[in-house]
Amino acid sequence: RMARREIGSITVGKRDGKRLTLDKAFMEHCKSEDAPTFTQYALRKACFRGGFTFTAAATASEVVQNVVSLDVTSMHHTFINGRQMPEDFVVVSNHDMDVFAERILDTPMQYVLDNYDRPFDVAIHARIRFDNIRLRKGTCFDKWGIALEPASKFKKELMYQEGFGEDERNLLQDNCIRQYGWHDVANNAFFAFGKLYRADSAIMNVSETELWCLGQVYEWDSMEALFGEATAKFRTPPDFVTLQSNELFEMKSAAKFISKHYKYGEPYPYNLSGIPEGIANELRNGTCDPQFFESWYTGTVKGMFNGIYGTQAQDVRRPSYKVERGELVIDDTTKVTAENYEDHEPGNLRVLYTYGLRIVGGSRMHMVISMELLYRGLGDRTRVLGGDTDSMKVSCDADVSDDMLAKALEPIADASKAAIDSTMSRIRRNWPDKASSLKGIGSFDIENRGEHYPWHIELWNKCRVSWDGERAHVTCAGLRRPIGETNIETVITSLINAGYPIEEVLQEAIGYN
């Protein structure tokens, strides 16, 4: 609502004698890029992948020392604001797709970094067969045991688990396209930590960014395109979305600064631009409740900021709910199939799925490149242990400093800045009052510089335990840690403080059972 009211109403010209707003222009763009056929719709969904969550097999369940957390600043916004978007996809011959795929795979990493706003001259959604696929020898991925392709993409059906955050409607529509065969397929495959490590053959649905990442992580004997669509036409991402990102980044940065420096009862002396007037007045007077401000910052500002990507990644054709016997249930009559696809054309469309697919695809590329940069710069002196979407844990030799880590990752920070500066030039020229410098976006922040975790263990995806010398820090999806109550963190901390060996406690405290 904020976007449509404050940004969507901006006039950008006239059409047929009527005012053309950013909102109207964006809806027209979304409509023109909507998949024209069920086959293209299903292919695009099959190409979509979430953030890169992984565990390094070489060090899984092993207690390691001197571990640092590297976190990307506003990962998705790097690609909301710093990547040219493809448009006007058309189905192409398999021969042409083979040529496009080879060109993408032949692109050197340095070229990708030098042209981070548009690393390839063609964009694709393709179904490709790979024979004898395995981790690429001599790479950091082979050495650390890190694979890329999620096992979930190879399943014929996904199971709904209530309470795990997934919308049941998304799952149902995903399973619908899988019934038509739109899922990845592998023969005699080996999976571990939720990833494909090798297979005699595999058929995968990939975009250009995912295909390039595949070429960095895996090698294969032969490759053949089976179907796909492509385009060589690119454009600056929609101002309707990037202006939201710019404004909310400034608001988020200001709110983060305020939460660190505001003291209740004392007038706030610093700049309050970007903060809503009512809250700004209370801050000036020193009467703003710190708990309220923190709640507004974490719940509203960060929520809106993080929600921009999610909006562009949603499936507008997912089925609807209906009320049946007083309960909400999925209305099966609204499920989109190959037979009724044309009957489910969306109305006012504000979702650009090809954009959302490449925002998260860019984040996966960012992580792949970052690991290669660490290995290129520091070799065996660092070991990536695991990661999740925009962060990774790295074990370092004792003589590896934070400055050395930052230096190794400097190329991707420079590439991100250059890509954003290039892509955002129009916004900065046309709306300087709304534009942001987006400073630091895409670069890695070293958590607690100089204070590495002396002990750490990666167990499985999204499950890890760190010991900071005084207490345990546990990340484990689905495991509750109620504040003020006995939980896994207090148990591990108590056991170690009682004299039990750290390595034994970290390995035994959490398990599947």
Model regions: which residues?
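Conserved acidic
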Residues: R1-N513
